[in-house]
Swiss-Prot record:
Organism: Pseudomonas aeruginosa (strain UCBPP-PA14)
Record's catalysed reaction(s): L-seryl-[protein] + ATP = 3-O-(5'-adenylyl)-L-seryl-[protein] + diphosphate; L-threonyl-[protein] + ATP = 3-O-(5'-adenylyl)-L-threonyl-[protein] + diphosphate; L-tyrosyl-[protein] + ATP = O-(5'-adenylyl)-L-tyrosyl-[protein] + diphosphate; L-histidyl-[protein] + UTP = N(tele)-(5'-uridylyl)-L-histidyl-[protein] + diphosphate
Binding sites annotated in the UniProt record for ATP: G90, G92, R93, K113, D125, G126, R176, R183, D262
Record bears the keyword Manganese: yes
InterPro entries per record: SelO (IPR003846)
Binding sites annotated in the UniProt record for Mg(2+): N253, D262
Keywords of this entry: ATP-binding, Magnesium, Manganese, Metal-binding, Nucleotide-binding, Nucleotidyltransferase, Transferase
Function: Nucleotidyltransferase involved in the post-translational modification of proteins. It can catalyze the addition of adenosine monophosphate (AMP) or uridine monophosphate (UMP) to a protein, resulting in modifications known as AMPylation and UMPylation.
EC number: 2.7.7.-, 2.7.7.108
Domain of life: Bacteria
TM helices/strands, residue ranges: none
Designated gene of the protein: ydiU
Family: Belongs to the SELO family.
Disulfide bonds: none
Protein name (Swiss-Prot/TrEMBL): Protein nucleotidyltransferase YdiU
Amino acid sequence: MKSLDDLDFDNRFARLGDAFSTEVLPDPIAEPRLVVASPAALALLDLPAETSDEALFAELFGGHKLWSEAEPRAMVYSGHQFGSYNPRLGDGRGLLLGEVINQAGEHWDLHLKGAGQTPYSRMGDGRAVLRSSIREFLASEALPALGIPSSRALCVIGSSTPVWREKKESAATLLRLAPSHVRFGHFEYFYYTRQHDQLKQLAAFVQEHHFADCNAAERPYAAMFRQVVERNAELIARWQAYGFCHGVMNTDNMSILGITFDYGPYAFLDDFDANHICNHSDDAGRYSFSNQVPIAHWNLAALAQALTPLVEVDELRASLDLFLPLYQAHYLDLMRRRLGLGVAAENDQALVQELLQRMQGSAVDYSLFFRRLGEETPERALASLRDDFVDREAFDRWAEAYRRRVEEEGGDQESRRRRMHAVNPLYVLRNYLAQQAIEAAEQGDYTEVRLLHQVLSRPFEEQPGMERFTRRPPDWGRHLEISCSS
């Protein structure tokens, strides 16, 4: 077991040089204190789950102290934001402190968000607020517990440093972990600035360290892009199956690894709404829940354009054409499992689509529907769920088709219940739960955010005494407006 002040660094990205990032030291926040830490994320670095030395956490991740081997850098990239190209973005408030190697030989980026101004701050103050830092922390740890690939969050550090957004708030930092922080926007930056040598250098770096199995391919960069498409198809399928809405799918927020990245005004669906918009700045609904699939394809096409100096256009198009069928296959498999169905059948896609159509416009809680569906026999579960639907006759027709489908597969109810409970969470990160934890933390009480994180780390298990975290949102929490302000 390692200690926090004795980590092994190997800063590979920093060695790419000044064309890729700029050396910047963290700007400390005042009176830093540990808000919450993740035992699961600590384990990735071979660190003990217990955060006994909270002062050391606060010093290191509040910007007051650095490891001797750390090389903090602000990365440069660009990207398409709401469909329009922004030629120069970069880490405006975050620093890649370095890369740590764990005992398994895995490299983990240590990225400190809220570390102060950088050359890419674009008139910003370089700070993150406690509110957004808690939201990113909770999501970064909740999604992996659901089986959704994501960057991770080691801890949040609070402070007395004031910052101004819509109102006066307090600054915080978040320590994010990921195998890489390279985004689609990194490739776009070097493509659109015609720095094709650096573009090739970046592609070679990513391929060597993160897509090593492509080395043996006849055309390694083409093989790498195909894998990026495959990973994103599976990622978006998991988002859609579990009702996760990202909110800001700009290309600079898309990880080259196909993991969920850069959390902002995200949301899990409460009542099912295919057209749900979780970002109140998204007036046109570009990043609505139902648009996440075509937008992911659009973003992959933007990445493909940036790779045209390295890969033949026909090969890029062929890989792009795989996205939708791959997504559909992953999504249907996930939804089949959520319905407790173990064997594929011809009409499964129609069964899923009909269910979602019946949910639309009804007061049906998306997550709890599947959990309740597995609690009892299909007949009893369907009867208890019926009243949540507006068109009960249409639901009855779906229910009969589903009941027959379950009957055809056979098996006993207890096996079905266990199978469904293993994939249908009892606890999901609802916005109102996050908001309650944030409001308590803003008053200096971190009990709620720590408890919520603990509950969400085991979303499929019934946890005695935690029933309040399963409840649907109260009226005030049903339509919380979340902005990009952070």
